[in-house]
């Protein structure tokens, strides 16, 4: 990780839909640190390729069954609200734009099945403003720090990759422009909330299970 402390300048954050529509740009590579920069607070601190602060998540609640997590920009402005769906047969979360007051963007539902499967969760777009296919599947192993969000053709639109020699609290998140870095991070947060209890075998162990519970 090039830097721990962010630059003072607050970068402009493009809207979610414009990020998702920029399909000709290279992937965004982020470094995710399982720690909040705020004292006595748990969460994520996310850096861009230059070591500048890109996103943050600050969790004050220590509950293992949180109802809501907010992804913020450098200045603390809500970019996405990840909210648990009530009365769902499977563990399901909905990702909303901004402070979560109106626009649902994606649904992330935990995979449930009797047969062994590489699938951990299913992601479904909920907004026509997102130029995305009908569905994604999250596959891989959190225990190995290796998982991917794949489209119907099996192509990865986001990947969690192990970052060597820095311990388990730091990893890479690679996001393709058609999904966008904020939505990719939102999916990671939802997956973490589903699996941080450690249930479901080795493939279901949460890579980030200590993020908001250490």
Where on the chain are the PLM-derived regions?
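Classical protein tyrosine phosphatase
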Residues: 68-84, 90-98
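Low-complexity or membrane-interfacial segments used for flexible interactions
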Residues: 1-66, 74-77, 90, 103-214
